[in-house]
Amino acid sequence: MIAVIGNGLVAQQVIEVVKPNSVFNSSNIPELSNTAWDTIYCAAPSGNRIWAQQNPNADRSNVWQIINECAVTKFRRFVLFSSGDTQVKPNTDYGRNRLQLENYAKTLPDSSIIRLPSLIHASITKNILYDIKNNCWLDKINPQSTLQWFDLTCLQSWIYTQHREINVCSEPIETQDIIREFAPHVINELDYTRQGDKYNLSPYSYTREEIFASIKDYLT
């Protein structure tokens, strides 16, 4: 028996691959304990950083709801799709709350933590690639940031990993290089005085060239 927790973009990709018996979200997760599961795939809570930072208590409550329900549920294996922010920005509400869920996963005898960076996918609704494609919020892009990326269509290659913890990341890519390559018309309109986030998690699973090819596919 297979369960998936989550209803976001990553969860939808997991569902397509593992074909779960049941899918749970915040409204029906109390039913999780009604069944003994072989594997629970957790792609929750929401990956919306802005919402999590604006609603830290609600975000924290969502995390603890997952932990508390899993604590009274029988299962053999737990696979958590987490965020690189737990390593790079653990002092933010978003990073701290997801780190709490990682810490729970680490207490389990059979678990994997798969940390994902910024995502490339046709259905993304907010990141710098979405902003470039839709010509919105370009003035909010921080060209001083260095991010790592993952093409979510490749998730199937990682779902069945046996690593206890793994960062699924590309080589670090400076945001201004992405702007220069794909939106050169705004390169001189950006604010270069702000300090940017610097992501450099290892190992690197994808090269800069592979990521640029995925970005090009997304934008064109």
Go through the PLM ranges and name each one.
Residues 158-220:
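Mid/C-terminal beta-alpha module of Rossmann-like enzyme folds, strongest
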Residues 1-3, 79, 112-114:
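Conserved beta-strand elements of the Class I
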Residues 13-17, 104, 181:
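Rossmann-fold NAD(P)-dependent oxidoreductase module
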Residues 1-21:
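N-terminal Rossmann NAD(P)H-binding glycine-rich loop of SDR-like oxidoreductase domains
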Residues 57-65, 83-122:
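Catalytic helix-loop patch of NAD(P)-dependent Rossmann-fold dehydrogenases
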Residues 44, 79-83, 115-117, 169:
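Active-site beta-alpha turn of Rossmann-fold NAD(P)-dependent dehydrogenases/reductases
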Residues 30-73, 83-89:
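NAD(P)H-binding glycine-rich loop region in Rossmannoid oxidoreductase-like domains
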Residues 106-154, 160:
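NAD(P)-dependent short-chain dehydrogenase/reductase
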